[in-house]
């Protein structure tokens, strides 16, 4: 049985005060939670602060990006070794904001995936279609292409212990969200697509939903059999709202 994971992507938000306050409030709100794994991905410069603030809790540390290089003359980049050294475990790659604003290709994201696996870190591979692709009926085609960039170059075995986050681009930060049935259909397609290469691996892959997940829609999303948690943006910046999502995942997957 898959153990759900809810992860907060703080994006470009935070300050020393905010990190300390938010993590302290999360510790309080999530004190009794055991049926859902929790991770947070603060901005890089606050990773160590967040790690110290979360020490002794069940909150795992994550990061929002990684470089393909381990060291050298690559100004402004952060390596997988550095993230591992500071204690980050769940590393987001392929987020639509990176694909759009930084022109990251499927091939580059696949390289990041490989580097993370080599370092024993957990890739959180974001995939998803734009509004135009959705309206053109290309959702499955796009998701398959983004998965195949890894699957066809590294094989199915590398997906063991990996997290995939399905984030329809049209739903990120827009207030729009796929219906639970729509999200489930895509999640099932993703699992079935990997299962063509290895059914056992596909069954254990955690597939999160992302895209305007909030306290109001989380419970219904998590009742779907192939939705194993959420990658949460804006709602992860408020401890009470984030906790509602975590507890909804715990309750749904216990049922």
Swiss-Prot record:
Its main location: cytoplasm. The active site is at residues 95, 167. InterPro entries: Aldolase_TIM, TIM_sf, TrioseP_Isoase_bac/euk, Triosephosphate_isomerase, Triosephosphate_isomerase_AS. It catalyses: D-glyceraldehyde 3-phosphate = dihydroxyacetone phosphate. GO terms for molecular function: triose-phosphate isomerase activity. Its EC number is 5.3.1.1. Pathway: Carbohydrate biosynthesis; gluconeogenesis; Carbohydrate degradation; glycolysis; D-glyceraldehyde 3-phosphate from glycerone phosphate: step 1/1. One of its GO terms (biological process) is gluconeogenesis. It is found in: Cytoplasm. GO terms for cellular component: cytosol. It comes from the Bacteria. The keyword Cytoplasm applies. Substrate binds at residues 9-11, 173, 212, 233-234. The keyword Isomerase applies. Keywords: Cytoplasm, Gluconeogenesis, Glycolysis, Isomerase. Belongs to the triosephosphate isomerase family. Homodimer. Involved in the gluconeogenesis. Catalyzes stereospecifically the conversion of dihydroxyacetone phosphate (DHAP) to D-glyceraldehyde-3-phosphate (G3P). This is Triosephosphate isomerase. The lineage of its organism: Bacteria, Pseudomonadati, Pseudomonadota, Gammaproteobacteria, Enterobacterales. The gene is tpiA.
């Amino acid at each position: 049985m898959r153990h759900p994971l809810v992860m907060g992507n703080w994006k470009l938000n935070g300050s020393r005060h905010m990190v300390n306050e938010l993590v302290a409030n999360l510790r309080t709100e999530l004190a009794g939670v055991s049926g859902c794994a929790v991770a947070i991905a603060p901005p890089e410069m606050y990773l160590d602060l967040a790690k110290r603030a979360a020490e002794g809790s069940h909150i795992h540390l994550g990061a929002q990006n990684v470089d393909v290089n381990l060291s050298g003359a690559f100004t402004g980049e952060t390596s997988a070794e550095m993230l591992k050294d500071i204690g980050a475990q769940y590393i987001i790659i392929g987020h639509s904001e990176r694909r759009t604003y930084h022109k990251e290709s499927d091939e580059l994201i696949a390289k990041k995936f490989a580097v993370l696996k080599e370092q024993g870190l957990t890739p959180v591979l974001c995939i998803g279609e734009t509004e135009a692709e959705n309206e053109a009926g290309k959702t499955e085609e796009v998701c398959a292409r983004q998965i195949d960039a890894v699957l066809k170059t590294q094989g199915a075995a590398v997906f063991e212990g990996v997290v995939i986050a399905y984030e329809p681009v049209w739903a990120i930060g827009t207030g729009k969200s796929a219906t639970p049935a729509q999200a489930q259909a895509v999640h099932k397609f993703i699992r079935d697509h990997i299962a063509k290469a290895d059914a056992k691996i596909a069954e254990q892959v955690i597939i999160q939903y992302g895209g305007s997940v909030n306290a109001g829609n989380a419970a219904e999303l998590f009742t779907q059999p192939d939705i194993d948690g959420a990658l949460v943006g804006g709602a992860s910046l408020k401890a009470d709202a984030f906790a509602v999502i975590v507890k909804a995942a715990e309750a749904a997957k216990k049922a």
